[in-house]
A protein has these predicted regions:
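Mature catalytic domains of secreted/periplasmic carbohydrate-active enzymes
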Residues: 1-143
Length: 143
């Protein structure tokens, strides 16, 4: 929800309330906040201080949503899924250039293929959901 909202110029309102009997945050809410914090620690550059790009959303070959944000001359591509293997195809936007996976600095090659982008990761993703990929200054987009 956070990435989807930010990619469209919005904010995410968190409704977290402590229990009345002991003023503790319920475990399910706390777990979700911790998971969001861990993701932001690795990928926050794709969220904080960003703006929507000319395309807010796209889909992968298998139908998973992809979101885009931008800051200055950096484009962030954020597939809202785990990337199994070393490649991911994003439909509806053709990008080319080189990027980097924010969570670990892994190089990512972007190849335009018709109306799609093939993202080729130098190393497989390890565990993280929604790996943000940053492309500095050189992403050419063909809608």
């Amino acid at each position: 929800e956070l990435v989807d909202s930010v990619s469209k110029g919005g904010n995410l309102l968190l409704n977290v309330g402590p229990r009345g009997d002991d003023a503790q945050i319920p475990t399910p809410q706390l777990d979700r906040l911790k998971a969001m914090g861990a993701w932001l620690r690795d990928n926050g550059e794709a969220v904080y201080g960003t703006r929507p790009w000319s395309f807010a959303e796209a889909r992968t070959d298998d139908g998973a949503p992809v979101r885009f944000t931008t800051r200055g001359d950096r484009l962030n591509v954020i597939p809202l899924t785990a990337v199994g293997g070393g490649e991911l195809v994003v439909r509806g936007v053709a990008l080319s250039g080189l990027g980097v996976r924010l969570s670990d600095g892994c190089p990512v090659e972007l190849r335009a293929e018709g109306d799609a982008t093939r993202m080729i990761f130098a190393r497989p993703q390890t565990g993280a959901f929604a790996p943000a990929v940053a492309i500095d200054g050189g992403a050419a987009a063909t809608p």
